[in-house]
């Protein structure tokens, strides 16, 4: 402990011996401006742009008054600036009547939207029973079509087995080729059947029209 104290004292003594030989540095004070308004040099590159505008002139007038040499009339906004300020005030600070009218229009729009939504829901609910019937009919037709296709394919497979004359694997290439040929003939037969039915229906319609109009079926005029 004593050794550490002596060491600290020796360091302090060394510092004390070095202190008189050192010289402290004191920066000079900044130059004082003359009392009164100060106007920056427009030609100086270090001059801020805002110091050359009306904002700086207004600050000088606010600090020094008439001694600043600023005409009070020049601090008022121009007619164009005044119109811009009024438009900005109307946009960001609307009057009470304007806000009330805006709220009224907003509430009317929301009420109209709510009524339209309720009307749309009511119309959809009124159509719901018929939509359910249509959906059930579509499901039934889809099921009937699937059953008919299944029966048709089973019949064609039976015909293919009969034509081959022996049991064959339905997945074999020969069986699939024969099945495709039978399906093609079946589609052709159905198409011809539809065309025949259309022709018969057209002929029946023409015959009915001729029976209702005796003049049309009579002999040609001389």
UniProtKB/Swiss-Prot annotation:
Pfam families: CR6_interact (PF10147). It comes from the Eukaryota. Residues 202-216 have a biased composition (Low complexity). Residues 188-201 have a biased composition (Basic and acidic residues). Residues 14-40, 188-222 are annotated as: Disordered. A motif (Nuclear localization signal) lies at residues 184-200. GO terms for cellular component: mitochondrion; nucleus; ribonucleoprotein complex; ribosome. It is found in: Mitochondrion; Nucleus. InterPro entries: Ribosomal_mL64 (IPR018472), Ribosomal_mL64_sf (IPR043035). Keywords: Cell cycle, Coiled coil, Mitochondrion, Nucleus, Ribonucleoprotein, Ribosomal protein. Residues 144-213 form a coiled coil. The keyword Membrane does not apply. Belongs to the mitochondrion-specific ribosomal protein mL64 family. Acts as a negative regulator of G1 to S cell cycle phase progression by inhibiting cyclin-dependent kinases. Inhibitory effects are additive with GADD45 proteins but also occur in the absence of GADD45 proteins. Acts as a repressor of the orphan nuclear receptor NR4A1 by inhibiting AB domain-mediated transcriptional activity. May be involved in the hormone-mediated regulation of NR4A1 transcriptional activity. May play a role in mitochondrial protein synthesis. Component of the mitochondrial ribosome large subunit (39S) which comprises a 16S rRNA and about 50 distinct proteins. Interacts with GADD45A, GADD45B and GADD45G. Interacts with NR4A1 via the NR4A1 AB domain. Interacts with ATAD3A and ATAD3B. This is Large ribosomal subunit protein mL64. It comes from Chlorocebus aethiops.
